Swiss-Prot record:
GO terms for molecular function: protein folding chaperone; unfolded protein binding. Disulfide bonds join C234-C236, C268-C271. Belongs to the HSP33 family. GO terms for biological process: protein refolding. Redox regulated molecular chaperone. Protects both thermally unfolding and oxidatively damaged proteins from irreversible aggregation. Plays an important role in the bacterial defense system toward oxidative stress. The keyword Cytoplasm applies. It comes from Pseudomonas putida (strain W619). Under oxidizing conditions two disulfide bonds are formed involving the reactive cysteines. Under reducing conditions zinc is bound to the reactive cysteines and the protein is inactive. It comes from the Bacteria. This is 33 kDa chaperonin. Its main location: cytoplasm. GO terms for cellular component: cytoplasm. Keywords: Chaperone, Cytoplasm, Disulfide bond, Redox-active center, Zinc.
Amino acid sequence: MSDLPDTDFTQRFIFDDRDIRGEWVALDDSYAAVLARHAYPQPVATLLGELMAATSLLVGALKFDGLLILQARSAGPIPLLMVECSGERDIRGMARYEADQIAADATLAQLMPDGHLTLTIDPVKGQRYQGTVELDGKNLSECFTNYFVQSQQLNTRFWLNAEGGKARGLLLQQLPVDRQRDEEEREDSWQHVIALANTLKPQEWAEANETLLHRLYHEDAVRLFDIQPLRFKCSCSRERSGNALVSLGEQDAKQLVEECGGKVEIDCQFCNERYFFDASDVAQLFAGGGTDTASETRH
């Protein structure tokens, strides 16, 4: 097998002789783009990378047109981790943290005590779905596995890794009865693929996906599907920032500009882009003129 040149993608695979499917994700450039915009401490960067990998795996597995949002919240040193990924596989992520409370060797329970994980699916068509569970696990891989134990009948396991500026993830899921109808045989198959995935070593995560999957499952009939590219893309814009000002009402928007010394700044928490609006910009907004794309923005 040849190594794939792509750096950011998901790839689905199935076991031809077993009722099991998998999904692999690799995030290099998109993860690097998120980290380049924020000086996250390593424990925060690691958790955010793992959450990006998990979000990508779910988008690849669910196949929908819309937006998938994952939020992990707590009252601890990391009050928020948030990742959004669209059906077109545009991904962005951010974190809020208390820098003086982040220990390099802190566990998930110490960084996000009494935390909750919320999954939101906002489809272009259809009903919005949201589910919340406790962050129940020693790491995010266990938390996502436990989430699916509570919400689905099908066995599902996650493996997540974010080290060396690369985020990776593996999802395995048992499918409804088809090829294997004997319950004991199904359980043996599931334990077989799980046991092999558990042999993954930290240094192996950076390898090409085809190489790694072949090493794990070379004795099984595994069929890989086409890769689906991912990219970092922030959905913020000057127009959206202007709409936020309009939502305040004309009087409050003008007052805000005055209180800010003649120019209000709206920052994107995902990509750190800053949008500035002065009195003339606000007047133009409420006159129905929209936003001037030539006005000042900064990274």
